[in-house]
Amino acid sequence: MFSSVNTCWTLVGAFLVYFMQAGFALCEAGFTRAKNTGNILMKNMMDFCIGTPCYWLIGFGLMFGGTGALIGGFDPFIQGDYSHLGLDIPLWVYIVFQTVFCATAATIVSGSMAERTNFKAYCVYSAAISLVVYPICGHWMWGGGWLQSMGFHDFAGSAAVHNVGGVIALLGAWMLGPRIGKYDKDGNPHAIPGHNLTAGALGVFILWFCWFGFNGGSSLSLSTDATMTMTGLVCFNTNLAAAVATCVTMIFTWLRYGKPDVSMTLNGSLAGLVAITAGCDTVSPFGAFFIGFVAGILVVLSVEFFDKIARVDDPVGAVSVHFANGVWGTIAVGLFSTGSNTAHAGLFYGGGLAQLGTQLLGLVCVDAYVVIVMFIIFKIIDKTLGLRVPAEVEIDGLDIHEHGLASAYAGFAISDANSAAMTPNENTDLGEDDVTMATAKQMDAAVPVVREPVIHDGVYDTGMHKVSIIAKLAKFDQLKTALNDLGVTGMTVTQIMGCGIQKGTPEKYRGVPVDTTLLPKIKVEVIVSRISVDAVVEAAKKALYTGHIGDGKIFVYNVTRVVKIRTGEEDYAALQDVE
């Protein structure tokens, strides 16, 4: 007799874990550059769609088809008897639940190898992960294999899912090599900021939400007081560890970099979730607190280590989130387990080193197996299909070359142009931010004016001038109002990109100084004849002035001829209804 409550709960968990694919897709897309967004979305879609039939083909059988020490059994298309699992839910419900876990392990790899991986190669190694790599590791820990018989404990996958995916992510990123431009000739890292942290943050929120199904659903039961109590503890510990890790990462980066790092803090949330996954059923809330605390610091130090010392280019921090904290979470069971649901209590709860030793042994053996198998697979792929795309493809972006997609954002702006600005510092501050109090020298420094040289040989002053104004987009409304007040009613406005470099600009991304960044600006062009050029220039300078170098620049050109298409009027007459 199946339990309807347990069946529904397991299905809800499976559906939530499936929706993690959306979270991973948004997170990875936001942490990478816009020219590769379509490729990121395609990979996150296809690793699940490829993994599902592969896991059905032989993966589930290898994982749960028997109680052998090393593998379950060879059972193509799941035709065998699985009564030894002792399920009180339908087998197909359990298969769905395990399938989405398998897909999660495969999708972790996408982030660390982003922006330079051959799409065909990605499809092949995603299939390999779902066919043999994840199922065999999963059998050792969950399917009755040798680690499970020794008392190895991994409730929902810090080791089986995140550590396995993280090890593959680390190996793949190392074998691929860094993205073009990531390191200079001396090996110093350059920051390559993600193009949309809004999408990245939404992805993290989705993942956090779905993690209640990932961990909570792993109980497979809500039919007794004991299982309901355990599931409640699992969900509470999951949330607590993630929240603590997020706070710790924010504070740690604030102290370390001078400002709280947004992308690192988002990684901190995921680090806490990964770390608590192994022991969420067996640690107390105090244990969850300390697990999250360590995870929040570990993820920052790990990102810095792989970025600056190991020189492994991981665009989204997948290695630090999933590998480093998967390892930490698995070890933490041996430290903080209260003895509930584990063979031995943790070291800090009087259980000695027994559980800790088992956890360490399991990690070493699982990681060794994964590295050996995936190294062979990556090498075969590299020699046949090619693991990495050519340099010109990487530079142009994978979207256009791999998928024929000009832009994943066709018709939409992808920058928050209203807030983007160079950070003021001691080298740019002019000492006065009130335009009414600013001196002429300060005004000229903030908004320089460049006039076309007067040429006398064959060129005369027509009395008509083009004034071209380059300014921050956020200042457009003030500039437009100032020009309208002068009587200028016709203007051409163009959105452009530009930058200025001032020594000492304190921009950092994930602890690495950011190089020159193109920022959204506007170019406003007006043609004047009746209105004084000097009046236009002064009005523009007052509208744009903030007290810092880089407020804008004004160019003044002599105009030799103007023709109005509608009436045929020329020069001065052609301008009278647009001023």
Task: Describe these PLM feature segments.
Residues M1-H456:
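Glycine- and aromatic-enriched membrane alpha-helices
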Residues H401-L405, A420-E579:
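Positively charged, small/polar-rich N-terminal and surface patches that mediate targeting and assembly
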